[in-house]
Amino acid sequence: MVKKFVYGTPFETEAVVKEIPSSEGNPDYGTFSTENGFSFTTKLADDDMVFGLGEANRGINKRGFLYISDCADDPNHVESKTSLYAAHNFIIISGKTHVGFFFDYPGTLRFDIGYTTSDTMTVSCENADLYVYMITGDSDLDIVKQFRGIIGRSYIAPKFAFGYGQSRWGYKTEDDFRTVVKKYRENHVPLDMVYMDIDYMQDYKDFTVNEERFPDFEGFVQDMKKEKIHLVPIIDAGVKVEEGYDIYEEGCEKGYFCRREDGSYFEATVWPGWTHFPDVLNADARKWFGDKYDVLVSKGIDAFWNDMNEPSIFYSQEGLADFKETAKKYVEGDPEVPHYMVGEKLQALANNHEDYKRFYHNVNGEQVRHDKVHNLFGYNMTRSAGEAFERISPDKRILMFSRSSYIGMHRYGGIWTGDNCSWWSHILLNLKMMPSLNMCGFLYTGADLGGFGTNTTRDLLLRWLALGVFTPLMRNHAALGTREQEPYQFEHIEDFRNVIGVRYRLVPYLYSEYMKAALNDDMYFKPLAFVYPDDKLARNTEDQLMIGNEIMIAPVYTQNAIGRYVYLPEEMMFVKFLGNGNMFQEILPKGIHYVEVALNEVPLFIRKGCAIPVADFAESVPDIKEESIRMVGYEGASYERYTDDGVSRI
């Protein structure tokens, strides 16, 4: 059962799309206060677990830490980070009873989940203007499905988006991209997408293409399609301030950029230099910005990724002036300005919360200060594209995913989990984020495989790819200046061909399970706790996940390991895709097992009485041969497979 409670005058985020009547008073769970902002406090029993929060740090069970919903462009994802790129304010308290809460609040929201006091959870925010939805049910999964039912259907990607993609910040020219595709095809490593980071643009201007680097962009797009490759250009949130740039001039003329309190347009620096931010909370501006995607769609592009949309700010005029003044005092020998203060001021320039208080959105004629609705920017930037695609391409799906998000954006696109690093711990973080994201409606998700920042290693990349085989978004992405990490940069490319090839062998199953989850408000990834709630060991296992109703995955995520321990909550069939293209199968009883997994192998476990469809190796999604599909698993088991053309809107 879902109950809605109204506090103050909430901002309409449109995260919830189902009409729910308001209930009087407070939820009959914990204590609520509006005396000093808003707070909700409840005691946690020793065996209570807290699930949710979507894209957040640490484990699947969120107990024992402080999480802050405050979309932040901070690539240093160490354990102490309290905020990442997204704000997903849905939690479930799971113990002897099950209860879920969605706090529909677009500003900064704090979740102290046993951090200050181990047996107490407090959710708080500065302003007591929000909707609180309380959901009760028979199980954690029941609560998730009820929640998903009120926030609307998850985004459905085109089928080609379930192939493998190669990306790197640093591909600049048409020749760079052609070389990547050529090397993949020559080495027979599967590939469906190549991503275009900011260097394809003219001076980092949205909806432009550098004509020197791409003299015939439309022809290039068509050439790639002949190779069965979809190009995926990036779009950033900031619009360059430049006379003669049509997007800038139109936005100024129509009043579609965010303004300061005095009515002037707010300026901040991002990649293009000084920029304005489109006022995507203004419905007219949102439509205007979304329609600009047609500039590239009309040239044959059918996939995009939105970035820098927290929105990221390098510095503002005020921030720069403050830094210069501090540096000047230090140079002049001011004893009140030690050297470290200059460094702190420099670091504080980027994404400074004071800057988010300096600009406003025009929402139905009312000026709303950005920091009050900060977490909605990435959501509404992607919404602008999603709504535009329905007009531009009414019959055909377009791939879209974003870095920043709020619940509600899940209807318009997926997300990737941002600028991770080439750390073994980030493989595990990737794994643990997946079910939490699914709880909040984000199904088309994945991480930068191999790690975005720092230098990867061959073994780390192979192990991460073996997890990426199962994530809907499977993309290798790396930062400028890091070690090149395309598979052909390493010895024994046949190992990469095999691991990535397993993805294509499993597409008939993975795509089917994704579509079932999207169409039925279900989870593609589930924690073991949701499937085996009465099994104490399963409830506390966080490095294994269930996919659909048929399989469990348990990737290897430690360096130099030749395998790992796995807990089976029931009898299962251990299936290992071997480096030579064959499969190893063994039925294992319930219990703890050590399974060996070589670097060029991909393991999975099929539940008792189940089977899954597996195809032959293919180099692109369109090349997967329907007649090659056979069932793998328990003899006599059946599987209901979802199929469609992978293109038409549903």
Language-model features: locations:
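Catalytic and substrate-binding clefts that recognize carbohydrates or anionic sugar/phosphate headgroups
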Residues: 1-158, 168-170, 174, 181-186, ...
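Short, hydrophobic/amphipathic alpha-helical packing segments
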Residues: 65-71, 84-87, 178, 286, ...
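Aromatic- and carboxylate-enriched substrate-binding clefts and catalytic-loop regions
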Residues: 190-496, 531-532
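Glycine-rich, histidine-containing beta strand-loop boundary motifs that form or position
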Residues: 42-44, 55, 94, 102-105, ...
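A residue-level signal for conserved active-site and pocket-lining positions in enzyme catalytic cores
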Residues: 90, 147, 184, 224, ...
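Catalytic core of carbohydrate-active enzymes
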Residues: 63, 78, 376-377, 382-398, ...
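Short acidic-glycine loop/turn motifs at beta-strand connectors
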Residues: 92-97, 260-262, 569-570, 579
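Extracellular structured ligand-interaction cores
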Residues: 85-89, 96-98, 106, 129, ...
